[in-house]
Amino acid sequence: MGIRTFRPYTPSTRHMTVSNFEELSRDENGKRPRPEKSLLQFIHRKKGRNNRGVITCRHRGGGHKRLYRIIDFRRDKRGIPATVKTIEYDPNRSARICLVEYEDGEKRYILAPRNLEVGATIMAGPDAPFELGNAMPLERIPLGTVVHNVELYPGRGGQIVRAAGAGAQVVAKEGKYVSLKLPSGEVRMIRGECYATIGQVGNVDHSNLSLGKAGRSRWLGRRPHVRGSVMNPVDHPHGGGEGKAPIGRSTPVTPWGKPTLGYKTRKRNKPSNKFIVRGRRRGGRRDKSGRAAQ
C-alpha cells in the first residue's frame, strides 16, 4: 500500500493523505471488480442507538451508504484448497478483503493478509501447510510466528487481531494453552485448539493516513466530538462559567457525573484475568484480584 499526498490547492488538501489502492485487483480496463453479489447484505445503520432508539454511543451517525460484506472469520471449510480470485476494498473495516473460491465452487470473503497475491492457494485445517493465509490451530503454529484473526473460543471464529496492519506473535506454549503477544502489548493465554491465520493483516499504512478535513469524518459516520467545557451547565458537568473557565472539579467526569480520563472500569475479579500473563498497561503477571503483580 502506498500513500498519496496532494498539493495545498485548498486548505483541506494541505494535510490530506489517501491510499493509492495499488494492492487492489483491477480488470484489463483498470477498473475494480464489483463485489460478489451473493456475499453482500444490507444492514441497518445503528447510528449509535440501541433497540429502544436511545443513544448509547455518542458522535455516531450519517456516513456514506454501505453494503456489508459477509466475511468468513471461522475458516471452517477444512482441508479444501481455495484460490485467491481478487483483493477488494471493504468500506466496513480498515483491512482489505480477498475473494477466495474453493475447489467445490463455493466463494467466500476472508481478511487479506499482507503480501498475499491473486492466484495464491490457501487452506484451513490442522494439516494445512505452514504458508501465508492458511488457518490452523495455535498448537500447530511454530513459536515466533505472526498470526491474525485469532479465536478466543474454539469454533466461535476470529474475534481479535483483525484490524489493518495488526498481528499477534506466538511467544510460548504451556500445556493446552498458547501465549500470544497482542498488538496492544498484552500477553494472553489462549487455548491451543483455537484457530488463527498465518501472517499480518494487510493495509499496514492505514494508521499513517490523515483525514485532512472534518468532512471525511462525516463520510465515515463520525459526528463532531464536542468538549464538555464549552457546553452549558444543563448539558455537561464541565459546562458554564465566563470564558474559558476551569471545569470546577478535582477530576474530570462524564456527562453523567462518573469519573473518567484514567478511571479504571475493568472489574478486578473478572474471570479472564487469569489468562492475562502481562497486562497492556503495566508489566508483570496479574494476581487473583486483577492487579498487576509487583
From Swiss-Prot:
Ranges where the record places region Disordered: 1-37, 228-294
A GO cellular-component term linked to this record: large ribosomal subunit
Basic and acidic residues: compositionally biased ranges: 23-37
Keywords: Ribonucleoprotein, Ribosomal protein, RNA-binding, rRNA-binding
Record has rRNA-binding as a keyword: yes
Single GO MF annotation: structural constituent of ribosome
Residue ranges, compositional bias (Basic residues): 264-285
Keyword Nuclease on entry: no
PROSITE patterns in UniProt: RIBOSOMAL_L2 (PS00467)
InterPro entries (alphabetical): NA-bd_OB-fold (IPR012340), Rib_uL2_dom2 (IPR014722), Ribosomal_uL2 (IPR002171), Ribosomal_uL2_bac/org-type (IPR005880), Ribosomal_uL2_C (IPR022669), Ribosomal_uL2_CS (IPR022671), Ribosomal_uL2_dom3 (IPR014726), Ribosomal_uL2_RNA-bd_dom (IPR022666)
Biological process per Gene Ontology, one example term: cytoplasmic translation
Annotated Polar residues bias: 10-22
Pfam families registered for this protein in UniProt: Ribosomal_L2, Ribosomal_L2_C
Homology family: Belongs to the universal ribosomal protein uL2 family.
Function: One of the primary rRNA binding proteins. Required for association of the 30S and 50S subunits to form the 70S ribosome, for tRNA binding and peptide bond formation. It has been suggested to have peptidyltransferase activity; this is somewhat controversial. Makes several contacts with the 16S rRNA in the 70S ribosome.
Subunit-level organization: Part of the 50S ribosomal subunit. Forms a bridge to the 30S subunit in the 70S ribosome.
Protein name stated in the entry: Large ribosomal subunit protein uL2
Organism: Synechococcus sp. (strain JA-3-3Ab)
